[in-house]
């Protein structure tokens, strides 16, 4: 039976339907099928974004794909309801995404616009690997999920007061009384003395100073927004997702319940410009190093390591484990995080048509 498709912006009921679909898939698979960015963009009507909804005969949302043509390559994320899999819905969504990847960035007629489609598979589960192989797709990018447990916080234990047994009083001993010597009163003398405690301290405007005159402080909403977006674009100029964040994207994240400016750290250069940043995100027992980046003009000074240490200290009292994502081909970052005690526990992958790429890898354990 043909599956009706709805292509275009989503209304409020559509958004709730897609969120319900994602929850059902996560319950069945043990991993969220859609990442944060597509969920934040469910209500977006940007011209470079396509929403594809598949419905059952009864009108239930049973499949969803989101196609993003804003980057160098088009990327897509898709999900099918667990009760409607192996019925052609996934293939229909993928073919629609492939067609839409050829559209111009801001809509229009399909054609050859140089957009290669990259499809995310979160967790890279066995059904996703089989689906990708059948469609002629191979892995072109790996995003590793690293974790590090924090030692448990042990509350101080109040010492138990000793139990004192009552002591029977000893009978008085009567000694013979010697005659008392004469009492000589001491002569008081007057002397002048001084004592005092000298304390010194310094303030840095709410932050702490690092080597080279850099200062680490917290993000100030409404003040640092534009400067941080510009810094982020410089730090992630080669990153296909992070480097494209806009002020509107920043504000979307600031509206999320997990946002806490006290866990959003900025490194200022001696001249006051932003040189680096680290953003943390706490949800449940997980404390994520959400994004850490350093302006290329300030790299090589240890700012990344300094910011990471500050972030981990912040998270240690707020979460049971630290988490972060890093590209699988970033050997330097992987080595740094391994030395810090992080280990890979899951992987998200991007698939592309088999004109290059690597064989489908074995999935890591679920988060």
UniProtKB/Swiss-Prot annotation:
Entry's EC annotation: 2.3.1.189
Low complexity: bias regions: 185-202
Top-level EC class: transferase
Domain (N-acetyltransferase): residue spans on this chain: 5-151, 214-365
Cross-referenced PROSITE patterns: GNAT
Alphabetized InterPro entries for the sequence: Acyl_CoA_acyltransferase, GNAT_dom, MshD_Acetyltransferase, Mycothiol_AcTrfase
Protein name per Swiss-Prot or TrEMBL: Mycothiol acetyltransferase
UniProt organism field: Xylanimonas cellulosilytica (strain DSM 15894 / JCM 12276 / CECT 5975 / KCTC 9989 / LMG 20990 / NBRC 107835 / XIL07)
């Amino acid at each position: 039976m043909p599956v009706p498709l709805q292509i275009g912006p989503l209304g409020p009921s559509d958004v709730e339907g897609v969120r319900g679909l994602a929850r059902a898939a996560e319950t069945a698979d043990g991993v969220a099928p859609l990442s944060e960015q597509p969920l934040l963009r469910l209500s977006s009507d940007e011209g470079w974004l396509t929403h594809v909804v598949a419905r059952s005969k009864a009108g239930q949302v049973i499949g969803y794909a989101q196609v993003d043509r804003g980057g160098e390559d088009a990327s897509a994320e898709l999900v099918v309801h667990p009760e409607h899999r192996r019925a052609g819905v996934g293939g229909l969504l993928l073919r629609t995404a492939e067609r839409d990847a050829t559209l111009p960035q801001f809509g229009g007629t399909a054609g050859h616009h140089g957009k290669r489609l990259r499809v995310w598979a979160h967790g890279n589960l066995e059904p996703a690997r089989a689906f990708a192989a059948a469609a002629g797709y191979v892995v072109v990018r790996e995003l590793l999920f690293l974790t590090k447990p924090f030692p448990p916080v042990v509350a101080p234990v109040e010492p138990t007061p000793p139990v004192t047994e009552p002591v029977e009083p000893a009978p008085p001993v009567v000694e013979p009384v010697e005659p008392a010597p004469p009492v000589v009163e001491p002569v008081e003398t007057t002397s002048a003395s001084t004592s005092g405690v000298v304390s010194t301290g310094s303030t840095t405007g709410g932050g702490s100073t690092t080597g080279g005159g850099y200062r680490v402080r917290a993000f100030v909403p409404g003040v640092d927004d534009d400067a941080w977006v510009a810094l982020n674009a410089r730090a992630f100029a080669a990153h296909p997702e992070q480097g494209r964040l806009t002020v509107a994207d920043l504000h979307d994240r600031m509206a999320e319940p997990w946002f806490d400016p006290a866990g959003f750290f900025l490194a200022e250069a001696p001249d006051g410009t932003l040189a680096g940043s680290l953003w943390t995100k706490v949800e449940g027992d997980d404390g994520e190093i959400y994004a850490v980046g350093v302006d290329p003009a300030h790299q090589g000074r240890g700012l990344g390591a300094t910011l990471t240490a500050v972030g981990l200290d912040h998270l240690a009292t707020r979460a049971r484990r630290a988490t972060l994502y890093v590209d699988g081909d970033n050997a330097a970052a992987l080595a740094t995080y391994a030395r810090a005690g992080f280990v890979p526990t899951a992987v998200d992958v991007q698939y592309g048509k088999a004109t290059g790429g690597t064989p489908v890898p074995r999935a890591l354990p679920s988060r």
